[in-house]
UniProtKB/Swiss-Prot annotation:
Any single Pfam family the record assigns to this protein: TruB_N
Entry's family note: Belongs to the pseudouridine synthase TruB family. Type 1 subfamily.
Species, as recorded: Shewanella baltica (strain OS223)
The UniProt record lists the keyword tRNA processing: yes
Enzyme Commission code: 5.4.99.25
Active-site residues annotated for this sequence: 47 (nucleophile)
GO biological process, one term: tRNA pseudouridine synthesis
Record's keyword terms, sorted: Isomerase, tRNA processing
GO molecular function: RNA binding; tRNA pseudouridine(55) synthase activity
Keyword tRNA processing attributed: yes
Gene: truB
Designated name of the protein: tRNA pseudouridine synthase B
Amino acid sequence: MARRPKGRFIDGIVLLDKSTGMSSNFALQRVKRFFNANKAGHTGALDPLATGMLPVCLGEGTKFSQHLLDADKRYLVTAKLGERTDTSDSDGEVVQTRAIDFTEAQLLTALDFFRGETQQVPSMYSALKYQGQPLYKYAREGIEVPRESRPITVFELNFIGLEGDELTLDIHCSKGTYIRTIIDDLGEMLGCGAHVIMLRRTQVAQYPYARMVTLEQLEALVAQAHEQQIDPSVLLDPLLLPMDTAVADFPEVNVPDAIAPYLMQGQAVRVPVNADLKTDELVRITLGDIRRFVGIGTMNEDGLLAPKRLIVIHDEPAETD
């Protein structure tokens, strides 16, 4: 008999406000431990330098983390002008220093270049892989490998301010956009070089900024629970967002209770649906009058709802540490 995983069967999403100086995986493991969750996964790593929104999916919520990886993001970034580094941020070594000499008109023209759909060549200091190895491993050995440009979209690029040699921007962009690369490219266009000294992710998909919580706040709640001699879950679980918020933009298809068992066994079922739904379009599946979320699926060519990823409903508690 397979050993059950340690931790609680707890499902949901924590909007972590990651602090600077820590890896996203370190932050993930701390959240998992605080919630005593059997399973956890984040939805797109932030560099150690970066702070801000890092949605952490717990339990069955991890099945939908890819859809947050694919979501739009928003960042507040401050760049130091006049210096270019090998990593395009302040964690790297300065490789070139140049005078800052551009006009306001030149800056605005350069910023406009990055708006809309463009192509971006990823930094060598990224987790993208080449022949099975992350690019940053090659970079640390002084090896540069070919990288193909990738399409990105910058929906908004707002000028916030320029104080001395520090430029601050607000950027709303598509998945896979490297803010460090935008800043490095901008610095080259301005002829002075630039690198990131502050990066904060302020939004992922439509998640509210105000719902973010820090590791310090989580730790304080655990300590408070111990003082009150109550289970930490009493104070922590209200912070969780429902896991279906990861696919909130998907159209809903509601399955009547009578045929729900067939769907939950993986069978395609016929249900009344919106005529506007396209074949193979991803949908959010709910059950019965209470509209309980159970996963995602697609409408196949026969007009049947085919489950693609369903949650597991646990009846027994998992083992604890």
